[in-house]
Amino acid sequence: MIVTNNRVYAKYNNQDLVNDAISRFPKEARDFNLFLADYQSFGDYLNYGNNKEILFNFKELKFDNEGMPKVKYGEGYYYNPVTLAQYSLAVYGEYLKGENTKENFLKIADKLLTLQDSRGGFLYNFQWRYYLNNYDYKPGWVSGMAQGQALSVLARAYKITGNKKYLEAGNKALNFLITPISKGGVMANLGSLSSSLKNNIIFEEYISDVPTYTLNGFMFSLLGLYDWANVDDSNKKNTAEKYFNEGIKSLTQILKYYDIGGFTCYDLGYITKNREKPHIAVNYHGVHIYLLNALYSITNDRVLYDYYKLWKAYVDTTEVDRISGVNRYETNANISKEFTKEGINTIILASGENYADALSAVPLASKNQCPILLGESNSINSFTINEIKRLNPNKIIVIGGEGAISQKVCNDIKKTNKSIVFERIGGKDRYETSYLISSKIDSKEAFLVYGNNYADTLSIATISAIKGIPILLTQEKYIPNPIKNYIDENTQIDKYYIIGGNGVISEKIESQIENTERIGGKDRYETNTKVLNRFIDELDLSKVYMAIGGPSNMDYADALSCVPLAAISKSPILLVPTTRQIPKSVTDFAYDNLQNNTNIIAIGGKAILPNYKINSIIPEK
């Protein structure tokens, strides 16, 4: 089957719309977890057999004298091909459990056949209006969903009877499903989304003058194709498999459009018909989740799994372990409280307003087995001063010059404890400060990192702390003089790790240093995971911290604060952006290396790092 590598991101975002849907979801949606199952063509369809009473609202159904369900539309009750198909699949599931329902299943399947016309289409013989149209469908309308669900019924009916009528009906149903709308069928293309997608197919649940691309109906039709591809006696099985694969390819291309940043929409009418906002049918978010799970179990396609996990996490109410505060300084102080419950000899005080000097201090904090507290340039906030009082250190190492942490701040701290000794490590710029700090670290290895962005430094910070490796800051195209001096003075260094791609540290720099190894990705998040994979043997993956890694220049503080704490347990820090997108490199690392019992701890508040981001990367399979 097809595996793709699309990235997960929200095409549309309206937080009020999302919040309303999430608040309604527990009351309006079925428990989608009941329908989560690895899919088998001749097995219990989506666990319907175990959940018939939950699947159907029997108050809206009326059963005829033969026990066939009818649904009310307008003033009358009618046979709906989808309702008949789903009810028969539930009865089939009961049969698989050992109940005496085989004949009832076949009776419903036969009733379904009475709705099939000579072309192979299953007809809705009642008038109905789709909310996006300004006209009614006349009796005899068709849909891709009905075709797909009928194929799932007919595949099972033929499997347990060998009766050719089901085989013939299924082949006709398949032919109708893959017939273009322009020729009277239900197959469309995705050209209304993008000209680049005009060759991608989709099976429309509701035929309209402008395609609307209803998601659940499309996925149900794909299950039908998969089922028919597994009917050995069908001369159409290869055709079914071909269109299933093409449909999966389309699905992976368009899932991003249904993600509105915290919930899913029902269709894409908000794009194709230029509607003001997406249409949300709250219960169908759960349907999307269990259909994606079923299709992933068939294809092993990572894109499907990524969206399954993400959409499931959107409505996961499970709280996650979290260390946070009202701002970066309280978060920093709370992390320090986790670092040690008692007093401590030394602490490091670095700028909470500028990342350069603070990040260079990571291996020094590890050497002194102490936390890094964050301060402001000309004042000391209450969270930091109270934590200093609690820790009652003998010594404070101030990182950076007076532009980073002023003498006034030191004097204010001194007022709380006159016995505190201050040591300042600060050069005329970030490169000299990096040199001065690194000169205090004994190591045979060093990290060389771009000095004008914190992202790559955050990626190696935990490894730097665990292994005691100094962090040297450099320019993109030349090595600053203080760092040149370090390289010349420290001949014991036998390996320099260059962090980041050629766009941040040039090949020219690499050529000037012996014994280098470059670790870099296409962005900061891939670099982060490549670093973690490179040093995976140094890490204990039973606990993982997750923090924001950008894109703002101020998004470094929580991850930096966490480094000394993470180093104690040799835990990695996974970086994610503040945007809703979860980079593929992050999910790949999580799914490949973490377990479903891994303790993932969020660093920072829910506003910047919501629960769903953590829950979405916890592996299930």
Indicate residue ranges for each PLM-predicted region.
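Well-ordered alpha-helical segments within folded domains of soluble proteins
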Residues: 80-95, 141-158, 212-229, 279-297
